[in-house]
């Protein structure tokens, strides 16, 4: 079997410091110690593909167990919508959302899934999670 030629593309996404993402707001969870699961499904996620400059569309699903703070919904909507003009790879989207979410509300756990629309006959689903130790 012949080795496959590998090509490493030097494509730049929007630097983190230039993303201008809307801040995530929180409110106090009045029942700390009582574990509940909160699910969000954001069906209109859009970002820009750094390779093609075309829009990428996805459904972002997020499930978390709050600790002492909950995410405020309007700020979450504005945060997700603020990716609209960001050049970013699918894999990086989910990791950035995870990092920002954990930094904002310090949940007991969170699972995030990005279900990206088919592009070039390939469907991409990216998952990441966090568990407070």
Model-based region annotation:
Residues 1-133:
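N-terminal intrinsically disordered, cationic/polar leader segments
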């Amino acid at each position: 079997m012949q080795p496959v030629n590998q090509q490493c593309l030097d494509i730049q996404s929007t630097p983190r410091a230039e993303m201008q993402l809307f801040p995530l707001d929180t409110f106090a969870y009045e029942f700390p110690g009582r574990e509940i699961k909160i699910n969000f499904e954001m069906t209109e996620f859009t970002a820009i593909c750094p390779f093609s400059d075309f829009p990428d569309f996805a459904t972002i699903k997020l499930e978390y167990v709050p600790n002492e703070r909950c995410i405020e919904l309007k700020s979450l909507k504005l945060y997700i919508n603020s990716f609209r003009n960001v050049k970013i790879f699918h894999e990086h989207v989910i990791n950035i959302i995870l990092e920002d979410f954990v930094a904002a509300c310090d949940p007991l756990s969170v699972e995030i899934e990005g279900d990206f629309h088919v592009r070039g006959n390939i469907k991409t689903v990216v998952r990441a999670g966090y568990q407070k130790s």
